[in-house]
Amino acid sequence: MGTVYGPNRINGRSRVEAIYEAIVGRIDRGLMRPGERLPSIRAAAQTFGVSKNTTVEAYDRLVAAGRVESRPGSGFYVSQHRPKRGEPPSPASIEAVDIIWLLREQLEKRYEVRIGDGRPPAAWMEGPEMARALRPVARPGQRILPESYGPPAGLPALRERIALTLAERSINVTPAQVLLTHGANDALDMIVRHFVEPGETVLVDNPGYYPLFGKLHLAKAELAGVRRNPDGPDLDELAQRAAATGARLFFTQSLAQNPTGCSITLPVAYRLMQIADTHNLRIVDTDPFADVLPATSPRPAALDQLDRVIYVGTFAKTLSASLRCGYIAADPDTVSALADVKMITRTNSSGYIEQIVYDLITSGRYRNHLKRLIDRIEVATRTAHDSLSRLRLPVFGQPAGGFYMWCVLPSGIDDKELSRTAAEHGILLAPGAAFNPEATAGPPAMRVNIAYANDDRFARFMRTIGATF
């Protein structure tokens, strides 16, 4: 095993960068060979004279860069496949990579116990309706695959159906105000590309949706967090930050928010729109769980009728993550501008997937699927509350309707270090730090997926390390 030696003092660089560069330098000089195990987090922290948390961030960056492999339960090893040399990553790219490490772990699915996963179990999305939809049979005279790209805004029939659905939520739009996308993340990417300028300050939920933070960092934006309360954004902080920064955009998730699971109340939604008017803010509101929530839930878009609100919806959370289909609803000028962005960056969305989604909706199969999904969410929410109560882990607010709960941890716990330790035991946690848009550390917490909260292995782990109250 090689030993990593590093500086005790670091000039002109962050400690994370210094550790990263020291290890990469030893790998490049052949002093650490492919397959060789890196020192443990504790040993490396002592060698460099830094905290374990700093070492974890440096190791995460090495993994993201492909220089090091993480093997749960074993440690970190020099990658067997050395990446091709090229231009060094920009600081914006490095920040985005640091933010999306949790997404990478969710996609690779290396952990058996998935407390921090963003998705429900696959069984929740399976059933006869889904099976039939994914094996479409063409009717006489009907093509299985579209013969051309299709209109830039997406399948007209699905856009019409979405407009009807939005009307049920008291959001009155024409089909021309609906732009189809490859899911909510794709929609957010287009919005960021169009609206956000380098160096601009953007307001976001804190805690909030970490993939969005990555997109904003890539756009070289400055992020200013707005504290999330159980009943919605902290309105005093929103007004103060809007006035202080001159921000033009506030990205939020009003209902079943990720990661807290809590929803905005009607009085807060009204006041939110008043603040938006006062400070000339556009509100980008993502509503991924809309189809399993009451149509009468308070939505800023219904109060505003898409004057200041850009409304983002998706079928990926409630249908299948593999069927990447979502939409943007906004005023006509905004939709037209975003359609241009879509054509330049994507050409168009998938007419084939859009046709599948449309058929599911109009045949009634999607409605039947949603009924089962709502039942599963309700049962899992009750079970998760019971399980976390037995562990004496307080749940933030009254989460309902989505997949998540936000658990407060004892003040002495480092949630990132807890996540690292859990990974060594084959447990995926989602530490609160991943959902913090700012460099300052917030109170220790973690996001819990309600579908997995009742796992005995998670309970034993939390009790063993004393991470409960």
Model-flagged regions — what are they?
Residues 1-138, 339, 343-350, 359, ...:
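N-terminal basic, amphipathic alpha-helical segments
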Residues 69-70, 395-400:
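Short beta-strand
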Residues 70, 173, 429-430:
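Short beta-strand "wing" residues that participate in macromolecule-binding interfaces
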Residues 139, 143-279, 291-306, 377:
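Conserved core of the PLP fold type I
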Residues 201, 222, 282, 394, ...:
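Residue-level detector of anion-binding/catalytic polar loops
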Residues 204, 225, 283-285, 357, ...:
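Hydrophobic residues in well-ordered beta-strands that form the structural core
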Residues 310-390, 396-397:
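PLP-dependent aminotransferase class I/II
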